[in-house]
Amino acid sequence: NVTYNTLIKIADFIAPFGDDVVRFSMRQNIHLRNIPSKYLGNVFTFLTKIGITTNAPLLLNNIVACTGADTCRLGICLSKGAGKAMRSVLGKSDLPLDDLKEITVNISGCPNSCGQQAASDLGFYGKVGRSHRMYPAYHIVAGAKIGINPKLAELVGEVSARDLPKFTID
């Protein structure tokens, strides 16, 4: 997640390059474009200086989450917090994350799919779990295919919100 102040710093830095420089993707990434190659080293140095991680395994920066119950009235689960916890657990694991470059992980705090979980390799969407009491949990979906012969991810299980980070490394 990028803060307001960080976005202002980026905007100030790229302003001299013109109006057609920044794009935001459906995967919640910021793309800087139309920057002459002779300035790319400066861009890299600047982003590193303001704390934008560029050397982490792609999977860690490829986890998309909707805003969830933090600010959404429909949210059941804290999806942004779940994404942050997943990044932390995966980053500390011994898993070969560099081999998982093309894997997408999407999280929605409720069934509404704002986090686009149905279009991901591994997706989660919030639900109310019930045992002896109600608790926040996630449905697990997997196997979406984008492109030729597209297919939506299919429901494969569920996990409590508390156990979600551990689930990602098991």
Give the label of every model feature segment.
Residues 118-170:
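Mobile "lid/hinge" segments at catalytic clefts and subdomain interfaces of large enzymes
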Residues 1-133:
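Small-residue-enriched alpha-helical segments and adjacent helix-cap loops
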